[in-house]
Amino acid sequence: MTSSLSRPSGRRADELRKVALTRHYTKHAEGSVLVEFGDTKVICTASVAERVPEFLRDRGQGWLTAEYGMLPRATHTRSDREAARGKQTGRTQEIQRLIGRALRAVFDLEALGPRTIHIDCDVIQADGGTRTASITGAFVAAHDAVSKLIAAGKLARSPITDHVAAISVGVYEGVPLLDLDYAEDSRCDTDMNVVMTGAGGFVEVQGTAEGVPFSRAEMNALLDLAQSGIGQLVQLQKDVLGAGNV
């Protein structure tokens, strides 16, 4: 590894971008958060519906599902809305399924009861790491939605069992890096997205060699970086939620 590598962002190899979680960002949703990872900005909302999908009818449990999308000019050039095209891209479907899986990993769906939490993640500005930012922000939005259910007497206890957060890591010019922005992500040798719980359990690891295969040692270094970064994100979630969080 090259210790003298200069990242395009000027950050250390193990340094997150500036991360902010702004709660109660919109008026109507039971939970809403603006999550910012540097120049990546995503609005995450959590909406509660007192019903479940047909496949869960009469099974005594709830459900959590997610949708993901990007504003037409969230990136350097404008993209048509997927609604105008008539279908979602494979990337969109993959990301929203990932967000749903990540949050369900820390929900006791039986304790949630026969209701659904709908997570919506809308990228208003993209500079790399939109899916991981979405997961990190969506957890806080879902937590606030659950708090409202408890306050309304609809839940006796929280169905949330742990925190969950996510981060990107990658190998850039031979050096493992934490929290890739677009300039790094578009040129990295290896790209990996990692989702973990507050207790340190892995929910998902998505890793791809963009050109040169990566070694087991590099994979271990990337996972160590991800674990460190996610630990910082979980602490930020706890800080913004304050007393009464998981």
From Swiss-Prot:
Coiled-coil residue spans: none
UniProt keyword annotations, A-Z: Nucleotidyltransferase, RNA-binding, rRNA processing, Transferase, tRNA processing, tRNA-binding
Binding site for phosphate: 91, 129-131
Signal peptide region: none
Function per UniProt: Phosphorolytic 3'-5' exoribonuclease that plays an important role in tRNA 3'-end maturation. Removes nucleotide residues following the 3'-CCA terminus of tRNAs; can also add nucleotides to the ends of RNA molecules by using nucleoside diphosphates as substrates, but this may not be physiologically important. Probably plays a role in initiation of 16S rRNA degradation (leading to ribosome degradation) during starvation.
Family membership: Belongs to the RNase PH family.
Name of the protein described by the UniProt record: Ribonuclease PH
Gene from which the chain derives: rph
